[in-house]
Amino acid sequence: MPTINQLIRKGREPKERKSKSPALMGNPQKRGVCIRVTTMTPKKPNSALRKVARVRLTNGVEVWAYIPGIGHNLQEHSVVLVRGGRVKDLPGVRYHIIRGALDAAGVEGRKQGRSKYGTKRPKEGGKK
């Protein structure tokens, strides 16, 4: 326990916060190239085949990124935009691919929550 005098002289050093998405290096998004597009099985109570991609970012770091939405057009050498955000039931997947940006097309036939999946507004045929 420091004395009051020691605290006046030196002060307390704030703890450094550890990033949850270190590969982005402080950027909101990073561009990358898909190395491998595959599926993963989730942790214990859940069961599915989640679509993921191994992405090499422009800074040379390779990460696993989740492909959200139903259906996708990604394959090897697709250029994608990656954001932070983990997938709770997939260990090691700490990033998301942004749909509707670069080579990742938006989700087809989506009516609600379109902005999260890069889907354009559907053409209205009469009434709203």
Curated annotation (Swiss-Prot):
GO biological process, one term: translation
GO cellular-component term (any): small ribosomal subunit
Region described as Disordered: spans on this chain: 1-30, 106-128
Keywords, comma-separated and alphabetical: Methylation, Ribonucleoprotein, Ribosomal protein, RNA-binding, rRNA-binding, tRNA-binding
Domain of life from the UniProt record: Bacteria
GO molecular function: rRNA binding; structural constituent of ribosome; tRNA binding
Keyword RNA-binding: yes
Cystine pairings recorded for this chain: none
Residues bearing the modification 3-methylthioaspartic acid: 89
Family: Belongs to the universal ribosomal protein uS12 family.
Function: With S4 and S5 plays an important role in translational accuracy.
Subunit structure comment from the entry: Part of the 30S ribosomal subunit. Contacts proteins S8 and S17. May interact with IF1 in the 30S initiation complex.
Name recorded for this polypeptide: Small ribosomal subunit protein uS12
Underlying gene: rpsL
